[in-house]
Every structure is written in structure tokens, then in C-alpha cells.
């Protein structure tokens, strides 16, 4: 407040990214929130592997197996995250949905040098959420689209690998 009783303020545009933070065992990962189409309880998802919601079939994605982590998906907090990037649809079972959070882009960190080769396709970066290290997963990898690179012919694979950094994007 100035001496004349007026407020002096400036509006600062802060870029943020929204993520759904989930837990699998002791690991925390985040999915870009713009791809989340729904979060279902065990009863809502049913016992089938694929989940149909609003006329769309979401194929099962075993993220715990893909990350090689042990997760107890029999608990009361287990949820199925319906996720899509516009052309692939996955039903991702997680041990717990932790939060939907907005993160300032400056708080999204690049992967350390220990992450090499394939891991750089799996994760786009990392962040801290309530003192937990959270890895930002690449939606194309989660939905199995990057696995198609392995199945492609050598010439096509080189083109796909060259395009991968753009698919992964920045840390956020």
C-alpha cells in the first residue's frame, strides 16, 4: 500500500502444468492431467481388463509391471485411471491416486545423468510433491506407443527415435 492508500501490484504470469500424482508401491509418478478422462473405483471399473466408459474402450495398461515395481492393487485405495492422448486409450490401475496438482514449470526438473537410454523415453522429468520425488511419465510410453518403435523396421525406427524428444517434450 502506498502513502495515499492505493495498492501497487503487478500481475505476474506464471506458467504451470497440471499433473495427476499416483502411487505404485513406494514409487510416485505423475501423468499429465490433460489426458485424464476419469478415475474409477474398483466397483466402477469392474473385473474386466478393458474398461468401457462413454462408448470408448480403454485397454488395460500394467504400469507397475512396465516400471518393474511391486504394487498391491487389492487395497481399498486402488483406482483405475482412464487415460488418453487423443489416439490411444488406456485403463491404468494404480495403488493410490495421491493428488491433482498444478506445478510451476520452473519446479519441473530434468532427469539426472543417471537416467540413460530407454529411461529418457519413459520419463520426461521429475518434481517434488510434499517431499516425495515424483517421476513425470511420458504418456506415449505409458500407452505403449513407443513400444511400436521396437517393432518398426530399421529405417522407420531411426525416424521414430529422431522424433522421440519432441514427443517427450520439456520436463513439464
Predicted regions and their residues:
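An acidic, low-aromatic, low-complexity terminal/linker signal
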Residues: 1-172
